A protein has these predicted regions:
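N-terminal beta-strand motif that seeds the catalytic metal site of vicinal oxygen chelate
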Residues: 1-25, 81-82, 136-160, 187, ...
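Vicinal oxygen chelate
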Residues: 2-9, 13-22, 51-54, 71-143, 224-275, ...
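Short beta-strand/turn micro-motifs at beta-sheet edges
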Residues: 3-6, 68-72, 136-138, 194-200
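Core segments of cupin and vicinal oxygen chelate
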Residues: 9, 19-66, 151-195
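Acidic (E/D-rich), amphipathic helical modules within compact regulatory domains
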Residues: 42-52, 56, 85, 108, ...
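Residues that act as N-cap/strand-start positions at coil-to-secondary-structure junctions
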Residues: 47, 78, 117-119, 175, ...
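Structured core of small recognition/catalytic domains
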Residues: 145-150, 157-262, 266-273
Length: 275
């Protein structure tokens, strides 16, 4: 057991996530050719294909599925949804490519708390595999970055308590079954209270998780809070292949069942070691 710490136990930023894919080559083609990503590493074996792709400041993982199926989306308003912000030039290029790809896509009309993204121009679409993605036009020519997540929840109060008490995140806004949880580095998690969780939310997909970068001392403080709350955390929830000895990381579930990770490695460090 780790010694008790006086650290605040806060996260630094939403660093990366892993998405389920049905056809790895098709998914890689989409994220490279349409979203402008760069392949960092491929790790394949008989049970799973893993592709890690750099998108601006962050990276995502694309993990093949042998049992669970990702359904074709019927709407762009389901859950979960994954949001990026890109430069104005990149936004225009990607929007044109999405129309050429002839996928499910539309302009985001909502503003403010419903998007978690203020008044920036945006577009919602489904990737080649059926994952729901949102893209917003950022200011200036800053590189692309992860910006927000949309999660559904059966109990908004419980979810708010989890993110504010366990991860020490901030409740920014709340209105009519919606809550925006602020993540440092100008990121957010938008929580939507629903009567029934999305099938994609409740399905267990191999490797799917959402990772937050933390400092070493904050890692141990968060683990202490998880233990006090009776929340199970363990590293063998995840994929250990490629883990460096000095890397800290553990996995646990939030109230809707999404698997979260805290780790002291960030996307920049991962990219340096990935090749």
């Amino acid at each position: 057991m780790e010694p008790k710490t006086s650290a605040a136990g806060t996260v630094q930023h939403l660093d990366h996530f892993v998405l389920p894919v049905m056809q790895p080559e098709r998914a890689e083609k989409f994220y490279v050719e349409v979203l402008g990503g760069k392949v960092l590493r491929k790790m394949n074996d008989a049970s799973v294909n893993r592709t890690f792709i750099k998108i601006g400041q962050n990276h995502i993982g694309l993990f093949s599925q042998t049992k669970a199926v990702l359904p074709k989306p019927e709407t762009l308003d389901s859950f979960p949804r994954y949001g990026f912000v890109v430069s104005g030039d990149d936004f225009q290029k990607i929007r044109l490519k999405l129309h050429v790809a002839d996928g499910l896509a539309r302009k985001i009309e909502k503003r403010g708390i419903a998007t978690g993204c203020g008044a920036d121009e945006g577009i919602a679409f489904a990737d080649s595999e059926g994952n729901l993605v949102e893209l917003f036009r950022g200011e200036g020519d800053a590189p692309a970055r992860l910006h927000h997540l949309h999660f559904d929840t059966l109990d908004l109060e419980e979810s708010i308590r989890f993110y504010t008490d366990i991860l020490r995140l901030t409740l920014l806004e709340r209105d009519k079954g919606l809550a925006v949880i602020g993540v440092p580095s100008r990121q957010s998690i938008v929580l939507h209270e629903v009567a029934e969780l999305s099938p994609v939310t409740t399905t267990t997909y191999r490797g799917r998780h959402f990772a937050f970068h933390v400092r070493d001392e904050d890692f141990h403080a968060i683990v202490e809070r998880l233990h006090r709350a009776g929340i199970d955390e363990r590293d063998d929830h995840g994929e250990r292949e490629g883990r460096r000895p000095e890397q800290l990381g553990t996995y646990f579930k939030e109230p809707s069942g999404f698997r979260l990770q805290i780790t002291n490695e960030d996307s920049a460090t991962f990219a340096a070691h990935a090749r």
